[in-house]
């Protein structure tokens, strides 16, 4: 099988994590624990992204969405990646130019992509990414299990109680300009 040449021992795999928030930090720890070589770009220094994506087996996007990250993964970034590399997006869908991603995947300029998020969710049936063989798109329900549902229900009950007592809520999410969402 021609794919066997791409199977590497973990200690020979190189991964670039783009975005060093909660998700990025957890990924770094997990990947390093199994011997994968990891480099990190935080959200303040990703302007050199096109240069930094080279020579990695995996490029994992964990970026939040803001004015400076919108569509920062574009044709120049994808064509700078090695032909044997994979792109993974667990950040925000809008940080990726999907037309450019489609182009590089359709022309086999990179090996493949794994997306937990897309630009417009839910994904439309006519989205051209759905018809490629070298992409896997999850339905953005990675935490949808019985255990995660139990945790979410407990968190909701705790927050409901805190709300009725005029206490600050837990796990509040803020948008890019610092407003609660």
How would you name each of these model-derived features?
Residues 1-27:
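Glycine-rich NAD(P)-binding loop of Rossmann-like domains
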Residues 1-6, 121-181:
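C-terminal helix-to-coil terminal segments
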Residues 10, 15-19, 59, 81, ...:
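Generic structural signal for small/hydrophobic residues in well-ordered secondary structure
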Residues 15-17, 35-42, 113-118:
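Short, hydrophobic beta-strand segments that form beta-sheet elements in well-ordered domains
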Residues 26, 51, 55-58, 100, ...:
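Alpha-helical elements of Rossmann-like donor-binding domains used by nucleotide-donor carbohydrate transfer enzymes
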Residues 28, 32, 105-106:
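Gly/Ala-rich phosphate-binding loop of Rossmann-like dinucleotide-binding domains
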Residues 36, 109, 131-135:
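A short helix-to-beta-strand connector/capping loop
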Residues 43-128:
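Rossmann-like adenosine-cofactor binding region
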């Amino acid at each position: 099988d021609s794919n066997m040449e791409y199977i590497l021992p973990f200690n020979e795999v190189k991964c670039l994590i783009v975005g060093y928030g909660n998700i990025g930090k957890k990924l770094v720890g997990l990947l390093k624990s199994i011997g994968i070589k990891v480099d990190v770009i935080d959200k303040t220094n990703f302007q050199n992204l096109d240069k930094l994506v080279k020579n990695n087996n995996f490029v994992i996007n964990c970026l939040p969405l803001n004015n400076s990250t919108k569509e920062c993964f574009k044709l120049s970034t994808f064509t700078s990646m090695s032909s044997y590399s994979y792109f993974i997006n667990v950040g925000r869908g809008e940080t990726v130019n999907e037309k450019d991603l489609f182009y590089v995947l359709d022309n086999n300029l990179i090996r493949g992509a794994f997306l937990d998020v897309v630009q417009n969710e839910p994904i439309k049936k006519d989205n051209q990414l759905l018809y490629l063989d070298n992409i896997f798109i999850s339905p953005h329900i990675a935490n949808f299990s019985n255990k995660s549902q139990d945790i979410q229900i407990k968190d909701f009950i705790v927050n409901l109680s805190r709300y009725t007592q005029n206490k600050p809520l837990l796990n509040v999410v803020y948008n890019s300009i610092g407003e609660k969402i």
